């Protein structure tokens, strides 16, 4: 089974003034910000610890103010230690060095990009391609679902188990949880009955099974004992499945949404601002915020595939980090989208009048405020504002004059992938990328239907212990990229098909540059134009920029790793 490493920063609070992310390079000059996880040493890794954990930024680089999320989230928090994407050593696509791989925190960056927002667009495309679910990751998750479903079917043979959330829509990160809903007929929700059965069958880690019976939607939270995938189980909740269908519909209308959402989810995840249970903004709320942004955005081409992702990302951060009035304004996406006055709408809420920092009307149930539990919305707002300042500076015309702009990552200034996440994905590829991966015998009995859908098992008849990363550890490699796969939701038959497509999806199409890219991003000295305030304090953007021709936007097609002619290097 997979076991993540100990948090070396767990007993040391991060300094309040620590900068968020320093300029990242593909050399080992910046790999000393975090020490490697302890599990790597237990696994026999020959990589030595970096010489220092307090590296300073490049002396010539202008670094904006510290990310407010750093000072507000101490690493002693257990939730943060459980988050593979938060803290830890940054992983990346570096060069091989001795017995290991040198990481830089940006494994998606395999080449130099154009300058400015065109380069940011290219990098967002590569990030999406790298972070999108791989076939073996979907296969692993389906096996987790099958194991849990077998326990549920043993208790209630007529129960119906369905997947919803990011796993159903395909917009999940490598460490995202799985959302399951169980439909059946019970007088009282059988939370504790299922909790006892999951413990009995050893499907989950003993300490990870928790029953949140007092929550708005009562759920069971657990961590799969073999894969460390987190699972939330609810009962008789219809809206979750309907919301997944709604997300798919909007994704078809706005092809840019998956690119924005994956970047934003990673941005919040590594700052521990993504859990509604702790006041953060959940995936559904974040998606609706992105939809509202695109609906009310001044660009007419926001719904066509070749929109510049870099421009949209920066303007998203500008809107929700700088201009949006969280105190007075609510978000509504029905009927083309609009802003609403919170004090008027909340009087008609299902739960009565409740002060809500972030009001987002549920399009499936207008009387429901899906953002009412996000009491940490102001902290998210500050993080968005920070990202806006950082990215605006990085794509400005003067950024090309900074040292090391040929190798530094623009997107890596606000997000990065930890060593732990990269190695976790390698472990998944090694386990589920094989044709005959042994089914873990230590997770209790699995139903015959689940066993049929999973790969064949070669585990010894005397219950050989499950293999762990200590036994299966391979050198981290992020060279092969697989595009996002749409999760099969009706059955797990698609799991077997994913294996045959694993090698065919690794090639990329050629990337084309467009003229006029220098005009894509408005000068930071002038600021973003065309914003007015409504009577309710919300940001309403005018149509000044709708007239821009589509050829001003970078054509967002996939690319090969190598280009025929060298282009301008990535700016800071």
From Swiss-Prot:
Mg(2+) binds at residues 177, 179. Residues 308-368 form the PAP-associated domain. Keywords: ATP-binding, Cell cycle, Cell division, Cytoplasm, Isopeptide bond, Magnesium, Manganese, Metal-binding, Mitosis, mRNA processing, Nucleotide-binding, Nucleotidyltransferase, Nucleus, Phosphoprotein, RNA-binding, rRNA processing, Transferase, Ubl conjugation. The modification Phosphoserine is found at residue 484. ATP binds at residues 240, 265, 283-284, 368, 372. There is a cross-link at residues 470, 497, 512, 526 (Glycyl lysine isopeptide (Lys-Gly) (interchain with G-Cter in SUMO2)). A motif (Basic, involved in binding of the RNA primer) lies at residues 557-563. It comes from the Eukaryota. InterPro entries: MTPAP-like_central (IPR054708), NT_sf (IPR043519), PAP_assoc (IPR002058), Trf4-like (IPR045862). Residues 36-76, 446-464, 499-514 have a biased composition (Low complexity). One of its GO terms (cellular component) is plasma membrane. Coiled coil: none annotated. One of its GO terms (biological process) is positive regulation of 3'-UTR-mediated mRNA stabilization. Its EC number is 2.7.7.19, 2.7.7.-. Residues 89-102 have a biased composition (Gly residues). It is an enzyme of class 2 (transferase). Pfam families: MTPAP-like_central, PAP_assoc. CDD domains: NT_PAP_TUTase. Residues 25-34, 477-494, 522-553 have a biased composition (Polar residues). It catalyses: RNA(n) + ATP = RNA(n)-3'-adenine ribonucleotide + diphosphate. Its cofactor is Mg(2+); Mn(2+). It is found in: Nucleus; Nucleus, Nucleolus; Cytoplasm. Terminal nucleotidyltransferase that catalyzes preferentially the transfer of ATP and GTP on RNA 3' poly(A) tail creating a heterogeneous 3' poly(A) tail leading to mRNAs stabilization by protecting mRNAs from active deadenylation. Also functions as a catalytic subunit of a TRAMP-like complex which has a poly(A) RNA polymerase activity and is involved in a post-transcriptional quality control mechanism. Polyadenylation with short oligo(A) tails is required for the degradative activity of the exosome on several of its nuclear RNA substrates. Belongs to the DNA polymerase type-B-like family. This is Terminal nucleotidyltransferase 4B.
